Amino acid sequence: MDFRVIGDTYRYGVRVSAIVMREDKLLTYKVEDQNHLVGGAILVGEASRKAVAREVKEELGVDCEVEELMFVVENRFDYKGELHHMIEFHYKVTLLGEVPSHTLDEGKYECEWIDLQRLSEYDIRPQYLTRELPLWKAGIKQIDIGFEKYYEKNIRGRLKR
């Protein structure tokens, strides 16, 4: 069971992403005009480090070495009128096999390497990585993507208690 709660007007969850870099490029997969990181929801009771290894295996079909935790993010955003509040763990990951041309999940999305210096030219999801990833040197960076003014104005009254 995924570690998430879904209501009528909101979605809350805990997820992981694999930040795979080679030769100053970031591995993503393309969904329409957006580029996403490999990752997904943590299962209830699952450690985040194990979750990212599982997601890499499920989506790419290769084993990996989960290295260091790079970012811990509290990310709140509105997507199609639904409030999303996600706690996210982004790990630096080294793949122990070849990258397939497409993901293995139902979508079979095309894998794409993006030059770190050109991230701003792409619609990377999550969007804050376009800004944060080129600045990262070492250690864990905590990021709070809040929109308190937007939340107070547009969403607070919609949440059912």
How should each PLM-predicted stretch be described?
Residues 1-17:
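Acidic, metal-coordinating catalytic segment for phosphate/diphosphate chemistry
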Residues 31-35, 106-161:
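Nudix hydrolase/Nudix homology domain
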Residues 37-39:
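Thr-Gly-centered strand-to-loop micro-motif
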Residues 42-65, 76-127, 161:
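Unchanged
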